[in-house]
Amino acid sequence: LAPWSKQYCEEEFPKYWEIVYSILQLFDKNSRVLEIGCGLGDVTAILCYLGFKHVTSLEKDELISRAAQRRIVDMFNMNGVVRNENYPSNKQYTADILILVNCVYAGQTKTKREYLDLIQKYYIYASRPNHFLMEVIDSSYTEKNSEFPEHIRLNRQDVEGLFRNCKISSWVTYRYPQNSKSKTLYLIERQ
C-alpha cells in the first residue's frame, strides 16, 4: 500500500515520531489540529493517543486515506478524523496547530520560490495557526533525486525568511548517508 509502512518492521521507530510526540504532549488537547498529508495516519494516531479532541487529517490519495480512516477507527473508535481531500482547496480551515511532516508535494512546484509560496499558502489556509510542525528535506542533502528535487530542499534561513517574527526550533530527523535523505523538523511558533 505505502512503501514507507515498512518502518514498522525496523528495530527503531522513526525519530520524527518521538520528537513529534514530545512536542505535541505539551500542547492544549482542546487545540484545533490540521494535519496535511497524513498518509497511513502515524501522526494522527499520536494525536488521538495523546487525547487531542479536534483533529482533522487530510490525505489526497483515496486508498491510503481509507486505510488511515480504518486505522483510526479501529485504534481509537474515532470517526471523521481522516478525510480524503486535497489541500489547499477552496475550503478554509481554522487551526491552532498545523502539521506537515513526512509529506512533500514537489510536483506542484518548479522553483524554490514556488515551493516556499506553497508552504506559505498551507499556513494561510489554516488561518495562520500559533504552532506549525513542518518536516522538510534539508538542503544538506545534495544527492541527485528526482523525487526530492533541489528546489524543495530547505535550510534554516529559508524557514526563517518564510516565518519572520516567529520562534523557530529545529531537530534533525534523518541524515544522509545513514538514511536515504536528510530531513529537519521545524516547530514554528507565532509570538
Q: Predicted regions: what is each one?
A:
Residues 1-28, 36, 40-52, 58-77, ...:
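Class I (Rossmann-like) S-adenosyl-L-methionine-dependent methyltransferase catalytic domain
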Residues 27, 123-127:
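A generic alpha-to-beta junction signature in SAM-dependent methyltransferases
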Residues 45-48, 119-123:
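A structural alpha-helix within SAM-dependent methyltransferase catalytic domains
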Residues 96:
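Conserved acidic residues
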Residues 99:
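A conserved beta-strand element that flanks and buttresses the S-adenosyl-L-methionine
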Residues 102-103:
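Short catalytic micro-motifs in class I SAM-dependent methyltransferases
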Residues 107-121:
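A short, conserved alpha-helix within the catalytic core of class I
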